[in-house]
């Protein structure tokens, strides 16, 4: 009797594992299928923020940042002196709900921009204030990113390195948005065509 119960538990456990693997592979294959489909369209989406573009030189990036700083639209921030700015939150009634954004270009060996990194957090974040957590921030940022970068919707992907991210792919441009910790949300925008590798 005990052996039969043990075998039944093993079957149930085995079935759950197989089901989890199938679901996980399906999401990953959905990501691969969407990436392939978008790259096959040969549409280029190189626009970033502040008239920056994938494919610009590193010097162009610094010149734009210099002008933005001169116009007092950005400041040199605390995170490795990356440019920073404050965004108004949709939930402006909550104290501390403005969002601090820092950003930096990703460059190849030829000093050509191949991507863009951004970090966000609520200015009033504290560990005990769940309203200003990265979970809530990520949901809000998805809407903002869709406005900044119109096109396809976000979908969730669990990558092999235990990274769970919201992904948006439009042509050659992939946007990953994910929680770094309870405070920060990271956004990484990259050219997936390999043109700037």
Description of each model-found segment:
Residues 1-23:
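Sec-dependent bacterial lipoprotein signal peptides
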Residues 25-28:
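Bacterial signal peptide processing site
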Residues 43-81:
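Post-signal-peptide N-terminal segment of Sec-exported extracytoplasmic proteins
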Residues 72, 83-104:
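Extracytoplasmic beta-rich ectodomain segments of secreted or membrane-anchored proteins
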Residues 162-167:
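Beta-rich nucleic-acid/ligand-interaction surfaces
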């Amino acid at each position: 009797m005990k052996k039969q119960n043990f075998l039944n538990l093993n079957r149930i456990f085995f079935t759950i594992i197989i089901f989890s693997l199938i679901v996980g592979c399906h999401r990953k294959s959905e990501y691969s299928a969407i990436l392939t489909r978008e790259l096959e369209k040969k549409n280029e989406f190189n626009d970033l923020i502040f008239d920056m573009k994938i494919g610009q030189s590193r010097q162009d990036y610094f010149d734009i940042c210099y002008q933005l700083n001169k116009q007092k639209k950005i400041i040199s921030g605390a995170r490795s002196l990356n440019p920073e700015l404050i965004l108004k939150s949709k939930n402006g009634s909550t104290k501390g709900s403005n969002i601090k954004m820092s950003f930096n270009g990703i460059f190849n060996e030829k000093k050509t921009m191949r991507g863009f990194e951004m970090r966000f957090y609520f200015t009033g974040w504290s560990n005990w204030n769940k309203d200003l957590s990265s979970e809530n921030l990520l949901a809000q940022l998805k809407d903002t990113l869709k406005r900044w970068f119109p096109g396809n919707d976000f979908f969730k992907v669990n990558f092999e390195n235990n990274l769970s991210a919201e992904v948006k792919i439009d042509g050659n441009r992939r946007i990953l948005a994910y929680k770094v910790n309870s405070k920060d949300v990271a956004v990484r925008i990259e050219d997936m065509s390999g043109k700037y590798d």
